[in-house]
């Protein structure tokens, strides 16, 4: 029987690579604004923030999600953090396991471990690796890392690292270990690996036709792999990432993204390899780019537009997912970006989670009984006046 979630249980978060595509702006200020944004999300009641790892091209400027999360956790109270994602082929698995365990303790269990093969070819080149090795490398790393997180001893050798009687000298705060997620974009490889190991699934983009269409089959691939390997998965452990910017009006949203959308598209056309923009998009006018992106499953509009988009993603997933993550792309300037997240918290989250249903029912009930209530109130007031008059007359008689 296919598992189906209730949409009102959907959680909300941000997926922060993050993107800072204007190379003329201060990266120092950008990093501190990223920390401030996480504080803002925490105050607004968001559930999660996922932080990326990148090492080249000057746009996705966080090299260590663990360092960023450690700082952000000290500034926040409730929001949970995910590594989105750690590129396992770049690291010795013992060092990665140790850092995640330490972070699990420092955050008192507010960390989730997302991993993948690495996204930027320039990163891979700089450490002397080949793109064709990455899928094998990431699973070699995970096969060593998972038992390390469980407190087991590992001896293992690959072409890039060796472990001899390796063990983590402290156990995780979260038992048996923090929740683990495998990243996925379009291919079936991510869901298949996640299912094989019983992991959560992080669908890192839904902003192209291919990625949107892949949602339809992702759960079945994930679930089939889990069943074939004696694992159990849960739709609540599925994260879906989308590209959104909302404002009070569609016109305002389009005006807001003029701040940085063009540079962001240039990055994906000229440098990065993620399928978020069609070839030649940078040659179009900005309005044409915006129209094309809206047609390609992006929201640049109002809270109602985003609600409709989430409904479509939910339908496409054939049963729902646990959290929707808004990609922190910095298309708008910082005040408009913060307002975007406020509008989601003010209007989109309450609608999806049906926070105000009870308020609406209470209003309807009170309205339906308004006239009878007024009659009863007037009777009560009249009774008080009559009692007061009775007492006044009794006092007059007594004083004679």
PLM segments and residue spans:
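Acidic (Asp/Glu)-rich catalytic clusters
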Residues: 4-7, 42-43, 69-78, 100, ...
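Glycine-rich, proline-tolerant flexible connector loops at the mouths of alpha/beta enzymes
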Residues: 48-72, 87, 119, 206-210, ...
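N-terminal beta1-alpha1-beta2 module of alpha/beta enzyme domains
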Residues: 1-81, 177-178, 363-364, 397-398
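Hydrophobic faces of well-ordered beta-strands that scaffold small-molecule active sites
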Residues: 12-16, 49-51, 81-84, 111-115, ...
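Active-site mouth loops of central-metabolism enzymes
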Residues: 18-32, 86-94, 174-186, 245-247, ...
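Flexible, glycine-rich active-site loops centered on histidine and acidic residues
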Residues: 7-29, 89-160, 200-203, 207-213, ...
């Amino acid at each position: 029987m296919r598992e189906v979630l209730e949409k009102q249980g959907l959680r909300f978060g941000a997926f922060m690579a993050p993107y800072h595509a204007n190379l003329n702006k201060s990266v120092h200020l950008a990093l501190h604004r990223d920390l401030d944004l996480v504080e803002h999300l925490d105050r607004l009641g968001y559930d999660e923030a996922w932080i990326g790892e990148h090492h080249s091209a000057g746009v996705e400027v966080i090299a260590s999600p663990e360092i960023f999360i450690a700082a952000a956790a000290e500034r926040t109270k409730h929001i949970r953090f995910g590594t989105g994602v750690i590129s396992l082929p770049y690291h010795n698995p013992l060092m990665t396991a140790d850092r995640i365990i330490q972070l699990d303790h420092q955050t008192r269990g507010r960390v989730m471990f997302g991993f993948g093969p690495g996204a930027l070819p320039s990163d891979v080149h700089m450490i002397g690796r080949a793109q064709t090795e990455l899928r094998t490398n990431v699973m070699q790393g995970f096969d060593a890392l998972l038992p390390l997180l469980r407190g087991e001893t590992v001896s293992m050798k690959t072409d890039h690292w060796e472990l001899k009687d390796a063990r983590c000298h402290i156990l995780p705060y979260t038992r048996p270990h923090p929740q683990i997620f495998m990243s996925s974009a379009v291919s079936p490889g991510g869901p298949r690996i996640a299912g094989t190991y019983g992991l959560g699934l992080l669908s890192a983009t839904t902003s192209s036709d291919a990625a949107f269409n892949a949602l339809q089959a992702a759960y079945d691939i994930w679930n089939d792999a889990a069943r074939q390997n004696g694992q159990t998965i849960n739709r609540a452990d599925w994260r879906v990432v989308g590209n959104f910017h909302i404002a009070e009006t569609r016109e305002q949203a389009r005006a807001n993204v003029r701040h940085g959308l063009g540079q962001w598209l240039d990055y994906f056309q000229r440098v990065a390899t993620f399928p978020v923009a069609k070839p030649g998009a940078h040659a179009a006018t900005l309005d044409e780019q915006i129209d094309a992106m809206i047609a390609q499953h992006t929201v640049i509009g109002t809270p109602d537009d985003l609600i409709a988009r989430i409904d479509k993603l939910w339908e496409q997933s054939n049963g729902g997912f646990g959290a929707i993550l808004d990609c922190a792309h910095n298309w708008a300037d910082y005040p408009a970006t913060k307002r975007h997240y406020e509008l989601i918290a003010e209007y989109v989250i309450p609608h999806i989670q049906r926070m105000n249903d009870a308020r609406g029912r209470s209003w309807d009930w009170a309205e339906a009984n308004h006239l009878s209530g007024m009659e009863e109130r007037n009777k009560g007031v009249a009774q008080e006046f009559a009692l007061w008059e009775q007492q006044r007359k009794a006092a007059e008689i007594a004083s004679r």
